[in-house]
Amino acid sequence: MDIVERFINYTKFNTTTNKENGLEGIMPSNPTEYELAKFIKDELSSLGIKDIILQDNAILIAKIPANCENAPSIAFFAHLDTSSEQKNDTKAKIVKYTGGDICLNEEQGIYLKFSDNPELKKYVGDDIVVTDGTSLLGADDKAAIASIVNMASFFMQNPDVKHGKIVICFVPDEEQGLLGAKALDVNLLGADFGYCLDCCEIGELIYENWNAADCTVVFKGVSAHPMNAKGKLVNSLLLAHKFISLLPGGEVPECTEGKEGYFWVKELSGNSAKTTLKIDIREFDEPKFQKRLEFLSDMANSFNKIYGDRCEITLKTRYENVFKFLKDENSLPIKLAKDAFSELNITPNIKPMRGGYDGAAISAKGVPTLNLFTGGNNFHSVFEYLPVSSLKASSEVIKKIVINAAK
């Protein structure tokens, strides 16, 4: 089966992550994630792969045994769910790009504009998969699934090509805090290291990401009727605003870039009696990350001394920087990726990821995992698109990694 046909088949499953179910501990959060996993399981089985596990939580693990000695066992990861930014069914279509704007939906006047996407000039003459402008495409991360299954198909059809053990793993609910990867038992993999395919444009290669933590501060006020509140009412909402005002104003997402960390005040809810404030902490450098956590803890202690034990703070690490587990830029997983790019004449775009991905959770469990491109653009948007040449290149890269690792 052609890789594009595989991808479009996967987009027909509406696997929008369900945040409400996720918060309740339901996995997969959307039952269609399991349906897609079952579909892929059957597909892998039809290729001749015998060692396949599909768990009730939609985690799918398949293994292709090594056909040579002394080659590392390599895992390839993708996620089944799509972002909840848009929830409509995907209506994917292929267009031949000749330049200029791409009409996604003539009836509704929706266009993928060249002025907003100047990188399109690289794809003139290419086939591009787009939507009708009313949904996500789901290249994040179904392009990855297509790439990995296509790679598996190659090795099953070419048994004379030497390779180590290949592990395929698809997980649910990445889009709401790496839930599937956190639930994964890596002991079932038997992998030495791995690659997530969850980057965007062709050439992207990531082996650094945020250290991330969640901060929750609960402010306790004293309620009173406003007609006789003088000297009695303590408004927890105003306490929260005073706390926020103590944060460094320039260290926020909208004022930072590259490896600059931040505090993100992302949610404030409550009333005069009780208010909950949620803050995301992000930093690449581990010592700086710890200093941010200490800063918030010290700030809460000082606040309580001033206002009389009016706040309670909870700090929880969400995920860590993958580079911590890869050790250095000469590690085997990074070298194999760079060599594959070079042999395929793909210019690597190496950059720190101002976000997280499944590899962060998986690396912390003992399987160092970096992040490779899928070829898609404009993730989490109705203007998401996937150049076919980039999708094919993604699969060629991981195929080359497996072959080179066995040499």
Regions found by a protein language model. Name each.
Residues 2-30, 130, 223, 377-381:
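N-terminal capping segment at the start of a domain
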Residues 10, 271-273, 348-405:
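Zn-dependent metallopeptidase/amidohydrolase metal-coordination segment
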Residues 21-71, 75-81:
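A non-catalytic alpha/beta surface segment that caps or lines the substrate-entry region
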Residues 51, 160-165, 249-264, 303-316, ...:
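Flexible, glycine/charged-enriched surface loops at secondary-structure junctions
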Residues 70-162, 170, 393:
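Active-site metal-coordination/substrate-binding segment of hydrolases
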Residues 126-136, 173-297, 301, 310-311, ...:
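Midchain, well-structured core segments that form catalytic/ion-binding scaffolds
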Residues 149-157, 242-249, 400-403:
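Short glycine/serine- and small hydrophobic-enriched flexible loop segments
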Residues 238-255, 262-264, 320-370:
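Active-site-adjacent substrate-binding region
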